[in-house]
Regions:
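Alpha-helical secondary-structure segments
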Residues: 42, 122-129, 153-159, 201-202, ...
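Ligand-site clamp/hinge motif
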Residues: 132, 218-264, 389
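N-terminal lobe/hinge region of extracytoplasmic solute-binding protein
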Residues: 44-100, 198-199
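Gly/Pro-rich hinge or "lid" segments in bacterial periplasmic/extracellular proteins
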Residues: 75-82, 164, 172-226, 230, ...
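Detector for C-terminal structural segments
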Residues: 17-29, 212, 217, 306-335, ...
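Surface-exposed binding/hinge segments that line
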Residues: 140-185
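Aromatic- and charge-enriched surface segment that lines or borders ligand/interaction sites
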Residues: 94-138, 157, 242-245, 293
């Protein structure tokens, strides 16, 4: 049994590289000679397909796994010979070079066609996509972007407002770098969800919600062929069922939860390997500070002291996660090693008494999967110990991701407590974009604002001194914690089990890059 740990060592330096063509990790898919004929890969995805619009999506699995199969990007995630995360030049470009800290030149591959008769992929599509991203829900990933200067239909230059070393990885390799068809998108009113008006990639897709996504060959694709002609991704929401499906030989790869990871380390399934994508996840319990029951900061701080994050790591994650003290993940500048509050039930009781609160009843909402429900159940017991009665309310992924967004209904007004986990990129600026003032009612479900926080966010993007960036991000997490609206929980590893006959390609954020997955 092999364990493939993907290192992030040297990431930031590598991400600022001036040219991508010289690195062996940057090949497009695989060569035609290596392409498998008629082979099918069977994988497991979980959760509902929410949206394939790169500027208006939840992100993560299965949205990104799908998006990377059917839309152009200038770069994807790759790894160098040491395992460090680097930009990987895609089949959609002949060349991409960072000429200087604020200019990235690229040349598109000619002859790549959009489906549904929308013509050739051109720099007009790239400009439209990037300009649109800069004003979308995901615009934080494009804060450094100023404009795209078109030279001709294939050549253009990305111009940044100021130097931002990880732009290729943070902004271009993730969903924010996905390119959509200008004419097709404008034709459907400027936005779409799960039915893309035009795609351009080696695969076509068909899907049935919560059942499957099937990827089949795109007959109009003139680029290099991926290793697997067909991919079937089946939806299995229950993690134990997914592990059983793998053990029964029904699927070739699946993400596994920490308890399964712990078990497979001791007793692996036959002919299997484990791949660890990274620990770029941060989980916390959020509190809606506008809710009448939680408006008093003493109540929120009491809840901070009531929750035992170490017990959650051991009970829900088998000790395989790292206890969290903020939103910056392990290995990154700005990672905290302690918080200003501690697990202290006596302090929690004293704060509740000081606030004159008794017989408090709250609801904890969580995604309906094993480790989140276990986490919420442990929190429920912690709160019970200080006199707070909590009810755990598991949610399917669709309703869960809608509940704090004002545009999706009125549920945000009812939110009290929730267990939340976001994925990050390999730079500390990324997680903070969701908590600035303008994200209230979108992704800042705790509903607080801070002028200092907003100013520091902008400062962190343009600051190049690592020591200064470290201080900025430490202070920003302190501001978040001081609202009383956050209980930091864990940073968990993203782990997959796969057949020894399959060489899985994983993004550092934990999704599968299926177009690069091939027979081992």
């Amino acid at each position: 049994m092999n364990i493939n740990q993907l290192s992030r060592r040297g990431f930031l330096a590598t991400a600022a590289m001036s040219g991508l063509g010289a690195t062996g990790a940057f090949g497009p898919f695989i060569s035609a000679a290596e392409a498998a004929d008629g082979k099918t890969l069977n994988v497991r995805l979980y959760g509902a397909l929410d949206s394939l619009d790169p500027g208006y999506m939840v992100g993560g699995t299965p949205d990104l796994d799908t998006l990377w199969c059917i839309t152009p990007s200038l770069v994807h995630y790759g790894h160098d010979s040491s395992g460090a995360v680097v930009p990987r030049k895609t089949a959609y470009v002949q060349e991409i070079v960072q000429r200087d800290p604020t200019h990235i030149d690229f040349t598109l591959t000619p002859g790549l066609m959009w489906t549904n008769g929308f013509g050739e992929l051109t720099t007009e599509d790239v400009k439209y996509s990037f300009d649109r991203m800069a004003v979308s829900e995901w615009k934080g990933g494009f804060d450094a972007y100023e404009r795209l200067d078109i030279i001709d239909k294939y050549k253009a230059t990305i111009v940044l407002k100021s130097p931002f070393a990880p732009f290729m990885i943070i902004s271009l390799a993730s969903n924010t770098g996905s390119i959509i068809c200008k004419k097709a998108t404008e034709g459907v009113g400027g936005k779409f969800t799960t039915d893309m008006p035009a795609t351009c990639g080696p695969y076509l897709y068909e899907w049935k919600q919560k059942q499957y996504i099937k990827f089949s060959p795109n007959p109009e694709w003139t680029g290099p062929k991926p290793a697997y002609e067909n991919i079937k991704a089946v939806f299995i929401s229950e993690d134990t069922a997914a592990a059983l499906a793998f053990e029964a030989g029904e699927i070739d790869a699946t993400k596994i939860v920490p308890t399964t990871y712990e078990r497979y380390l001791k007793t692996p399934p036959p002919n299997s390997s484990l791949a660890v994508a990274g620990a770029l996840q941060y989980m916390w319990m959020g509190m809606n500070q506008e809710h009448p029951k939680l408006k008093d900061i003493r109540v929120r701080k009491a809840i901070q002291h009531a929750v035992d994050a170490v017990s959650i790591n051991m009970g829900a994650y088998g000790g395989t996660a790292e206890t969290s003290y903020g939103v910056v993940c392990p290995g990154l500048i700005g990672k905290r090693n302690e918080s200003k509050y501690s697990y202290d039930p006596a302090k929690a009781k004293a704060l509740l008494a000081e606030a004159g609160v008794s017989d408090l009843e709250l609801t904890i909402r969580t995604l309906n999967n094993q480790e989140r429900v276990l986490t919420a159940t442990i929190i429920q017991a912690n709160l019970q110990a200080v006199g707070i009665k909590a009810t755990v309310l598991p949610q399917d992924s669709g309703p869960f991701w809608d509940m704090g967004q004002e545009s999706k209904g009125e549920v945000w007004k009812e939110l009290e407590l929730w267990v939340m986990r976001y994925g990050s990129q390999a730079d500390p600026f990324e997680p903070f974009q969701w908590f600035v003032s303008e994200q209230v009612g979108i992704w800042n479900w705790e509903r607080w604002t801070s002028d200092e926080f907003d100013a520091l966010y902008k400062e962190g993007i343009i600051e190049s001194d690592p020591a200064k960036r470290n201080e900025i991000y430490l202070r920003m997490q302190e501001i978040m914690e001081d609202t009383g609206s956050y209980v930091w929980l864990t940073h968990e590893a993203e782990v997959y089990v796969h057949r020894n006959t399959v060489d899985v390609d994983l993004a550092p954020t934990g999704e599968m890059q299926l177009i690069y997955t091939k027979p081992a």
